Amino acid sequence: RESVKQPVRISRCSTRRPCGTVQRALKNLVSAGLIVRKAGVGTIVAPWRRELENPLHTRFFDKHGNVLPVYTEVLSRRRESSPGPWQDFLQSDPNTLVIKRRLIIERPKEEGGDFCYYNHFYFDASKFPVFKTVSKRELNGVNFKRRMAEEFGLVLTRVTNHMSIYPATTEIAAALNIDAGTPLIRQRVYAYSMEGPLYYQDYWIPPEVPEIVIDTALENLADI
């Protein structure tokens, strides 16, 4: 009882350190993309998905001809050593990394409702270390080709697309919440810069989605 009655000693610095510690922690959370500071609002939890700026390879339109927004959610990022079309194209072993994303299109229910599709983005991590070091959450909504142009001066100059029908693997089925073996539209994307191969992508798109628009005959792909 006597010990409980004794006053607790608090030094002058102890009243300041927690504040500094909290501020540093908040700064770290902002840097990690976990929280966002907005003027007039305060600090809020960052959205788990973000809208993709100016999609190029897969665009969908509503009934009025407006481009539907695409939201991206990065699911994983890892080194890729297995064989595939990216291997011969990029020639980047053992530095090939793949970022796996789920892409969400939001539509009114009367137009079919929301739908998802799946993406693998392959690149040479030795050339583009920023995609390896930033948090996965920070990559949500990022236009990778624009980031490559802005930070590394590598502008997209040519794109080749290959389309086929492909059965959903267990991984793809889990990401899209569909049955394994479901027939999907597979889109393989080979992207080039002035210096050669830039990146390779795989898209898996449910067959019931609306018409896909792929426009690669643009005057300035760097603006995309």
What are these regions (language model features)?
Residues 41-58:
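Short, cationic-aromatic polyanion-contact patches
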Residues 67-68:
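Long, compositionally biased intrinsically disordered regions
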Residues 39, 47, 165-167:
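A general secondary-structure junction signal
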Residues 39, 49, 78-81:
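A generic structural motif
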Residues 58-64:
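Short aromatic-glycine motifs in intrinsically disordered, low-complexity regions
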Residues 18, 48, 188-189:
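Fold-independent oxyanion-binding glycine-rich loops
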Residues 71-224:
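C-terminal all-alpha effector/ligand-binding and dimerization domain
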Residues 1-45:
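N-terminal helix-turn-helix
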